[in-house]
């Protein structure tokens, strides 16, 4: 490929020959191009080297300076602006493809604005070269200039520095000092002497069109400059505002400019993409496309009645039920008082909740759950849900104000462990947090409690005021109500420690006392343990047990919600331990289910994703009368099974199938099957599940890579063993088969099975023959494999 210099060496002689040709009467650039069309062929292969504008400029230059030598012309047109343009090109080419595409889009948008609107340069200092033939120095001397005030308006001054410069021998000067021009930054401001207005250049700016107003003797001369000008401010006359000249993607002035530029577009719809893809312009899209508002003319004769032909089934009525989101049902189970209360809450949050600006939203339906908002539950500050046992709580508010409480409370916990033979030290931070929460709650409602428990106050109750020296054991013994404060704060600390313990510790301690204990009266048991501890630490004497019992009854009435949860947890644990202690015979797994679970009468085939439009289901859907003719068809006769059918069925069932069993979203291992129950290992813990419970609620989830498994085990709560468990098991499988049939073969008969046999293979082969009466079973399974898996997982693995 030829370079730019070689192309110019070919062009210059042709232009000179054309201009000197006397046979041509009317000489012009267009006529020259007509006679030298081959120049465009050359230009086609050298697009980046020389353009049509370059040829035109070269023609005008030669026409005005016919005697200039060829080498000088080639030198000037080969290198003027070359260095700067090369730097710009290299800088742009180094950008990543994605950034370059974004940059091109951004440039085109700004180029549209600057090319259509007249953005006037607002530069405080502008240098202008003024012709001075008496000046023999061809260098640009910034020191020798005269200053003139170009204009002053809108509190803005523009100072023009007129620099004398001899332009008579400009071309010869440029050709001789080409190297100096290429490496001198002061010529860069004047585009290497291509213009006489000097404004700084920046590669960070775009090559867009600007207007420079040059004022001479009250005459304003607008000069158009298109270059990478480093202009800080531009002025737009239509808005009478000055704008900072930055080329951000999200320019806040786009909206103002857009309202000005829309009337100037000849075909506004061509710019729809610009307006829709920009945040600042998208609001102007309707104004851009100029959609006229629909107007309605009033009728001359207004209609008094509108007659509507109603369908008959409209009279029957209809009902629309709101299907609750899955999280509304799950949160009820998660908030039930149980041994795994906090674990259930945290699992619920991990599965259904995402936080945005401290607000809790369901990731299925998008509804805000206010009780789980960070500001509502104070999860971050108090860890009401995410309980941490081994992390200091005094790094956050409000606990950092009570960091001095650690010494008193931690000493009490160590004393409790030593005296009562417990292990509460590992939960010291949680105990400290619960104590502070309780005291903060009492402090906020102290005046209300003083009126409510006036009788109890006379007997020793003292509602503490939260202060800086509350836990200071060195506080003056002369302080009012000193003994009452000491007794109440020691009791609260001991009470919270006991509530953080487990039922095994409480029952072990009460058993060692060798006294008859009524475990249904938990308040009395707590009073006994707290009294024994306070008596051994010499906080109370042996005659104050009734006082401690009064304290227990009173403080449990005003306990925080979390302490009440611990209280109920201990009651459940004690009931469970007592039940286990009584039941030393062979366990009956059929009656050991203590959780009541509602059983649905019918399973609906819902889609795998939930959207707001699908949360409404209309029932009692009736087909409009006279819409189509219903043809009554006779039932299809079910084929009788042959030896060949049995072989095909056995080949299908012989496929190696590995089944994954999951319990509560956790993989189960080492499954052992017995006549009445199943033994599984989940996270290194062995669990026992009675077989009859599988028909009550869906505990076990089955996963397989073989679609045949999902077809013939569809709706089967226990898809193992050669024999079914009971007649109820048979009914479950028949119901599941009909669900599958209704979804994938809606025009088929209802599947029935009248045998009393519990043989699994007979029932599954009967369903195979039922399917074979309508379709080729193998091909049908392959075609509907995705739908079958989806139906199985939605209905039985959710």
Swiss-Prot record:
Residue ranges of the region described as Interaction with J3: 234-254
Gene Ontology MF terms: DNA-binding transcription factor activity
Region (Interaction with NPH-I) residue spans: 1-195
Principal place of residence: virion
Localization: Virion
GO biological process: DNA-templated transcription termination
Induction (UniProt): Expressed in the late phase of the viral replicative cycle.
Keywords of the record: Late protein, Transcription, Transcription regulation, Transcription termination, Virion
InterPro entries: Pox_Rap94
Domain of life per record: Viruses
CC annotations in GO: virion component
Pfam families assigned to the protein according to its UniProt record, in alphabetical order: Pox_Rap94
Family that this chain belongs to: Belongs to the poxviridae protein RAP94 family.
UniProt free text on domains: Interacts with ETF via its N-terminus and with DNA-directed RNA polymerase via its C-terminus.
Stated role: DNA-directed RNA polymerase-associated factor required for the transcription of viral early genes as well as for transcription termination. Within minutes after virus entry, recruits the core RNA polymerase, the early transcription factor (ETF) and other enzymes needed for transcription initiation, elongation, and termination thereby allowing synthesis of early mRNAs which are extruded through pores in the core particle. Recruits the multifunctional J3 protein, with poly(A) polymerase-stimulatory, cap nucleoside-2'-O-methyltransferase, and transcription elongation activities.
Subunit field text: Part of the early transcription complex composed of ETF, RAP94, and the DNA-directed RNA polymerase. Interacts (via N-terminus) with NPH-I. Interacts with J3. Interacts with ETF heterodimer.
Record-given protein name: RNA polymerase-associated transcription-specificity factor RAP94
Organism: Fowlpox virus (strain NVSL)
Gene that encodes the chain: RAP94
